[in-house]
Amino acid sequence: MRYANSQKYFKTACDLMPGGVNSPARAFSSVESDPLFIKDGSGSKVYDVDDNEYIDYVASYGPLILGHCHPQIRDALKEQIDYGTGYGSPTELENEMAELVIEAVPSIEMVRMVNSGTEATMSALRLARGYTGKNKIVKLTGCYHGHSDSLLIKAGSGVTTLGLPDSPGVPASIAENTITVPYNNLEVMEQVFNKYGDDIAGVILEPVAGNMGVVPPNEGYLEGLRELTSKYGSLLIFDEVMTGFRVSYGGAQAYYGVTPDLTCLGKVIGGGLPVGAYGGKEEIMEYIAPAGSIYQAGTLSGNPIAMRAGIETLKVLRQEGSYDQLESKSKHLAEGLAKVADKNGVSVTINRVGTMVGMYFTEGPVTDFESATSSDNDKFVKYFETMLSEGVYLAPSQFEAMFMSLVHTQEDIEKTIQIADKALSKAAQV
């Protein structure tokens, strides 16, 4: 494949934007290359500015569970634009979206719409502190919750890819109120609560850690967190920005049967547009202004364009058989990758929950940040290069998931496995 136009546009972008991108995860620095510039997407495919076609498993880093340019979403957006893009006033669409979310997510009795996952998580922390009257937040090492100061500490996603333990610019006075604990380790969590429990406002985590690849919770782990937080009067906060409506219609909490106090959403609920939400028990959410005294606001929160896209997305997903299809396709992909890895003598660990698939170049098991980062990056780089050159678009980091969509075909999956066979044979030589 040729990438001349992508390289040209990236060179220009580097003079205009820090690192040439508007989000670090999009840079190809960890795979020693320049990023693709995409001009078009349709169904399960994307097309770059050099007219190369790719089977897409990035899915805009998760939101596009219906694929690119889904006709129902496209037509709804075209219709909505004729009525206006925003009013700064409440709309019936916000009610409809809220009803769909509340109906689907077990923990949510009341919801507030925002514009991003970062807004959702930072607002949830403020609410947890205001509601409990406590100061400290516990987060899990390798879990990424956006770029707000309180949470950009031992985070995953691009922070892990770039090898940054945290970020300059986060004041020590803020960092000292964030306690980090290894993922999947209840013993250490209990020790932290024994020491700081009287001042812990909440524990926030990705119930499936999707920003250090795909790391599911050990059996009993989420239940243990639920019991521990309840014992100390702290809130359990699930960051389901990635897992919400992706691992099941009710998210990871429905999948695992553990109900948090607060839930953060994003990605899928916007149908590809910028959106976020946080919600939970009514008695907690009523602390948010104007019902209560904890302030949070947004000029574009609940805007009709994002609401319309989200509504149409959820209507498609709740149709009978949608998640059966997604499960079948995702299982086929994961099992196929494992088979060709074994064929080529490459030690990999493949973790999957619902439509999220993660592959690590390590014998595993991968259960936390330490084991995730033991993956062989040199092997991943060779694998990534071959997959890309043969027409499969993966995130340029081994710490991002592959995302399945409803529009990926069996042909797409079989072709992906065939190309992975070739890519793994090359990775085996590294």
Swiss-Prot record:
GO terms for cellular component: cytoplasm. Gene3D superfamilies: Aspartate Aminotransferase, domain 1, Type I PLP-dependent aspartate aminotransferase-like (Major domain). GO terms for biological process: protoporphyrinogen IX biosynthetic process. Its main location: cytoplasm. It catalyses: (S)-4-amino-5-oxopentanoate = 5-aminolevulinate. It comes from the Bacteria. It is found in: Cytoplasm. GO terms for molecular function: glutamate-1-semialdehyde 2,1-aminomutase activity; pyridoxal phosphate binding; transaminase activity. The modification N6-(pyridoxal phosphate)lysine is found at K267. Keywords: Cytoplasm, Isomerase, Porphyrin biosynthesis, Pyridoxal phosphate. Homodimer. Belongs to the class-III pyridoxal-phosphate-dependent aminotransferase family. HemL subfamily. This is Glutamate-1-semialdehyde 2,1-aminomutase. The lineage of its organism: Bacteria, Bacillati, Bacillota, Clostridia, Natranaerobiales. The gene is hemL.
